[in-house]
């Protein structure tokens, strides 16, 4: 059946112009843009001057970080105008291995939202991570033939690239042999090190926190993903990239974003809105969110309103608010007047579901498990940078005579990362600054990328209660104060995702967020999202794993106590 969308203003992403035209669609494809009339179609819709633009593409997202299953994420993203995402399932792969990747492929099959996959490159991220699985190059090879697999996901182990680690280089070369892209992840890397990283065949990065850093990469041929997530907020710093000549090498991504933020603020549409509000050209922002992402990833016939292109289209009220009225996915109406039209949820094989549902293996913990035996007074403390995933090393005097080193007046709290997938009993314990808790404890099974149990608290008793609640729930988030659980959020899918509708997940997420802030958490941070990255030993500078503190730049374990 042919559909005519007439009397529309078309966003031409090839020319950065707004043009008056009609759009003729046949099945999944656009077959004409121009002076078509009612006689050319079986069905006609008069848009009365509204705007048609291509569907938005999120070029880098971890579905697991939304805490939603793929079908629930689709219900949230589609009304925001997102018709395609490029997902790296390295969160669930670290927990469940190949079964985790299979889960993501099956759970996203035939959704109105097109879900493409980048295969996880670093499972584990480095040798300092203890994960539920290890994926080598030979494990990934068979998956490159899947039609929705576009390449190798973010190569976080940039020290391995610089050292020419054989396994790392094999993964990169194998992706290239299949004609696939390799995503980058190398925060703060510059100069000769960056040259070597790019020369290895890594063609993009989403970790830039300054315009200068991004411009160096663009000038050396990389594509830049401008990220605005829940914890990592780089849009403001990277606004100069919306200008020429930089914009032609950029796309828009969220990376990690919580459901409440998706529902309340939006997705890629939110990034476009904020860029426009900051004075950047709306057509440039839309091009970055559509055609440039599609062309970079090799999505043929996607990302434009033009003959031969897939009819992934948005109907907008205007370019200032980017308010999405309707969404067409592959020629079918998926969102009408802001409401998602029901679609069938994909089926997942029972063996895959069983693996994902049983990922927590850990003995009960006691307060003594969080005790630190003093070996001196000067300690390394991880210091959070608000609005960033980067952390600093703070060496300071710790008074162990009171509260075993915790000092809420100086914002020094305890941090523990405990292995939860193989029951090794390994744990790293130290101190964290920048969270701001005045009492209580918080715990989560979401701790990038190994997703072991992570706990922050003001006292050992509450830390043990919070940790054990995560254990009994089979994963999730918990907030404890004065011996009582005051908020919790179960995440039974690999300890990473909920099985509830998006609105309920957002409500639970907001409840734990509010509870943490009532305990004194800093208003400058998103506590659970920031906490989740404190164990990722590939983002500078100091991180905590189950093996202890890691100096990311030197890729070595460092002692808690500074002798």
Regions found by a protein language model. Name each.
Residues 1-21, 25-29, 36, 78-80, ...:
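Active-site microenvironment of metallo-dependent hydrolases
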Residues 4, 55-57, 117, 252, ...:
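Residue-level marker for buried hydrophobic side chains located in beta-strands
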Residues 58-69, 124-136, 203:
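Active-site mouth loops of central-metabolism enzymes
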Residues 74-179, 245, 486-490:
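Divalent-metal coordination cores built from histidine and acidic residues
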Residues 89-92, 120-122, 157, 187-188, ...:
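Short, ordered loop/turn segments at secondary-structure junctions
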Residues 96-100, 126-132, 163-167, 193-197, ...:
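Short acidic, glycine/serine/threonine-rich loops at helix termini
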Residues 134-154, 160-225, 232-253, 263-284:
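Histidine/acidic residue-rich metal-binding segments in metalloenzymes
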